[in-house]
Amino acid sequence: MVIGLSTGSDDDDVEVIGGVDPRLIAVQENDSDESSLTDLVEQPAKVMRIGTMIKQLLEEVRAAPLDEASRNRLRDIHATSIRELEDGLAPELREELDRLTLPFNEDAVPSDAELRIAQAQLVGWLEGLFHGIQTALFAQQMAARAQLQQMRQGALPPGVGKSGQHGHGTGQYL
């Protein structure tokens, strides 16, 4: 028997014949990988605060030329920010961040371009992390919604009363 089910979303008008939406299968298969991504950020509020600060610093570096003292200060802020970020991350993400970020030469003052590149790289990595977390959370939400809908559909078929007798279905009949 073939059953037509609506996916419940009014904006895409998709009807699945056969009972299971292939989009939900993909969500369920990837759920274990994506849920682990949300566990990799141990202190999300701290990571968000530092990420926002780093992004603001990048905008400042782009906006005005920096003198030697400000470039030294920004180099120190960059190194401190990375250490603080690592405190809020699980070991897997710490290792990835360590591989991607190269320390500045302590003997020389970094140029404006070096600082911009380092800050942009860090901002890009953080934005990728945030997008990955958002995607994982969305996938979890979709999987939970699909599971709830399956539970609702299995509860009582339309037109069946409490005692198992067929009653009137819902809706208007002409």
Swiss-Prot record:
Coiled coil segments of this chain: none
InterPro entries reported in the protein's UniProt record: Proteasome_act
MF annotations from Gene Ontology: proteasome binding
Biological processes annotated in GO: positive regulation of proteasomal protein catabolic process; protein homooligomerization
Region (Disordered): 153-174
GO cellular component: peptidoglycan-based cell wall; plasma membrane; proteasome accessory complex
Keyword Signal found: no
Keywords annotated in UniProt: Proteasome
Residue ranges of the motif HbYX motif: 172-174
Gly residues bias (residue ranges): 161-174
Domain of life: Bacteria
Self-association state and partner proteins as the record states: Forms a homooligomeric, either hexameric or heptameric, ring-like structure which stacks co-axially with the proteasomal alpha-rings.
Role description: Interacts with the core proteasome alpha-subunit (PrcA) through its C-terminal hydrophobic-tyrosine-X motif (HbYX motif). Interaction of Bpa with the proteasome stimulates proteasomal peptidase and casein degradation activity, which suggests Bpa could play a role in the removal of non-native or damaged proteins by influencing the conformation of the proteasome complex upon interaction. Can inhibit degradation of Pup-tagged substrates in vitro by competing with Mpa for association with the proteasome.
Family: Belongs to the Bpa family.
Name by which UniProt lists this protein: Bacterial proteasome activator
Taxonomic source organism: Mycobacterium tuberculosis (strain ATCC 25618 / H37Rv)
Gene name linked to the record: bpa
